[in-house]
Structures are given as C-alpha cells and as structure tokens.
Design a protein with these regions (language model features):
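Catalytic cores of carbohydrate-active enzymes
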Residues: 1-77, 116, 120-149
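Well-ordered alpha-helical segments within folded domains of soluble proteins
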Residues: 21-36, 43, 47, 88-103, ...
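Non-catalytic C-terminal accessory modules of carbohydrate-active enzymes
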Residues: 52-57, 68, 79-87, 97-187
Length: 187
C-alpha cells in the first residue's frame, strides 16, 4: 500500500510507514504506476493513499508529515520550513506525474482533478493567495503545513509544463506513442 522513497548510503530506509516524519512520499507512488512496477491492486492502493493523505486543494504535497527534527543524514528538505519546497511543499512538476499515473489506471476524473488543482489558469479567483502570474507554473506552492498555504513561488524555473502536458496528452487524452505507432486510449 506504500512504496518507500529510497535508501541512504548507510542502508536506512527513507519513507517507511514507521518513520515519525516523511513516512509517505508522492513520487514513489506515482512512479510505481508509471513504471509498471506496481500490480493493479498495489497501484490502486498507492494512488488512493496519495489522494487521501497527500492531496490538497492546490495539488498533492511531496511528502507528509514534514521534517521538523527527524531527517536522514543529507536530507536537504529539513532546511526548509514545513510546507515549503522539498519539505512537504506542492512541487508543480510532480503534479504531471500523478496526473499520468491516475490516467494510466483509468481514473480520468481524478487525473483531471489533479490538473485543475494546480493549473495556473484555474487559480485566478485566488490571485491574492497564489501571488504569481496567472499564465505560468511556479516551481512549488506552499503546502498545507505552511502558514502561507497556496502561495506559489519561483516562476519559469520548472519543468512543469512538459510533465503536465505528458500527463494530460498521454494520460487524460490517452494519445500515447508506442512501438507500432500512436495508441489512442482516453482515460
């Protein structure tokens, strides 16, 4: 029901459910589906856990709970306040991957919901919170653990446009290239 984040050089597991902080990570769940590593039951459970534990009205946060005191050696996320950047912020580029993962599992409505939650044009009614141009993605949006939840930062410094495009075109619209040509399978 949960894919770990990785391992430290000393073999410590990062992102296991018994960790007091950062025990649930977004990217391993998304990529378990995209890579085909997860079987159908594992994929659906991993995606449901993301939706239940990491999703917010602005998109899915990178991990939860944020680091405060317990971080593995070399964890740079701990230098950021809770809810910002790599410390449980909402990284825009990762939204494209969760969109694609949901769509690949046939969850088109949920994939579209993730798209809308983080799409710049859908934020115009919250401009005083977002504080970023309405036509570009920010690198990250402050997550639910931040007092500035919903504020976006670092415009134009992100690969979000391409990952979201892949998530929407190959995922939601279902137009995927394969060895034999173009496969059309909308979610």
């Amino acid at each position: 029901d949960l894919f770990i984040r990785g391992f430290t050089e000393d073999g410590e597991v990062i992102g296991q459910r018994t960790d007091p902080e950062a025990n649930m990570w977004l990217n391993p769940q998304s990529w378990s589906v995209i890579s085909g590593l997860a079987n159908e039951a594992q994929a659906d459970l991993a995606l449901q856990n993301v939706y239940d534990k990491l999703n917010t009205e602005y998109g899915a946060i990178l991990m939860d709970p944020p680091y405060h005191a317990h971080a593995f050696d070399g964890a740079l996320a701990v230098i950021y306040n809770a809810g910002t950047k790599e410390n449980a912020g909402i990284f825009s580029q990762s939204q494209g991957w969760i969109i694609l993962a949901e769509a690949l599992r046939g969850h088109g409505d949920r994939a579209f919901n993730y798209f809308i939650e983080n799409a710049p044009a859908a934020q115009n009614n919250r401009a005083e919170i977002r504080r970023l141009e309405p036509y570009c993605y920010g690198q990250f949006t402050e997550g639910k653990h931040s007092p500035n939840f919903g504020r976006s930062h670092v415009h134009w410094l992100t690969g979000t446009a391409s990952t979201v495009m892949v998530g929407c075109v190959e995922g939601i619209l279902g137009m995927r290239p394969d060895f034999y040509g173009l496969k059309i399978a909308p979610s």
